[in-house]
């Protein structure tokens, strides 16, 4: 009984944190004027260069040894892990995988490392109440995850990582993207604040 009550209390606390985070982000989003960085828009529309494609993928996709050859993008998609509308200022086709501030009920807040042993223990309890804040359970409640799968299954793709830590909280989803047979390249970007600090 104690363990069950512990999880109930923990989930209530997570619900409270989610509510406060939503209030804070709505306030920030309404009060800030996002400065558009044109270099980000340029990167999003770049073709895929042969030199960026993994050696594994080159065996199946490229029949040329020309590393400077470019492959134009047939389709682009932003998979946004943020709740705000910032990415929609750069691009029209955006999947808010964790939901959006535009509809706070869709927001997915929690943890998503199904590869962790503790997840397996919770799952084996056969009580979905324990899984309320597990992201992959919530992904099934919207079409966003299915839309993402449809995109990555359709054709070879390149991933640009901007502003994401690639931490454990999204480990399972990132594993799906990074290890997919259509993923030909992963390019992480970071923001250089000054000579000593980056983000």
Question: Model regions: which residues?
Answer:
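Extended, H/D-rich, highly charged conserved domains that either
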Residues: 1-142
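A near-ubiquitous, low-amplitude feature marking generic local secondary-structure context
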Residues: 131, 135, 145, 156-160
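A short, well-structured beta->alpha microelement
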Residues: 140-150
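SIR2/sirtuin-family catalytic core signature
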Residues: 148-199
């Amino acid at each position: 009984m104690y363990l069950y009550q512990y999880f109930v209390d923990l989930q209530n606390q997570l619900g409270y944190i989610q509510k406060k985070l939503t209030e804070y982000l709505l306030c920030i989003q309404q009060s800030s004027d996002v400065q558009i960085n044109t270099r980000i828009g340029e990167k999003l529309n770049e073709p895929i260069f042969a030199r960026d494609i993994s050696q594994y993928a080159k065996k199946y996709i490229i029949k040329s040894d020309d590393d400077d050859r470019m492959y134009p993008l047939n389709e682009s998609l932003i998979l946004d892990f943020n709740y705000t509308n910032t990415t929609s200022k750069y691009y029209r086709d955006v999947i808010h995988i964790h939901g959006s501030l535009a509809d706070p009920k869709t927001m997915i807040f929690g943890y998503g490392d199904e590869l962790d042993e503790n997840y397996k223990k919770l799952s084996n309890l056969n009580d979905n109440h324990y899984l309320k804040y597990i992201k992959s359970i919530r992904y099934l409640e919207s079409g966003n995850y299915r839309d993402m799968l449809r995109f990555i299954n359709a054709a070879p793709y390149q991933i640009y990582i901007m502003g994401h830590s690639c931490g454990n909280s999204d480990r399972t989803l990132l594993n799906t993207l990074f290890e997919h047979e259509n993923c030909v390249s992963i390019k992480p970007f970071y923001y250089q604040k000054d000579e000593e600090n980056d983000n």
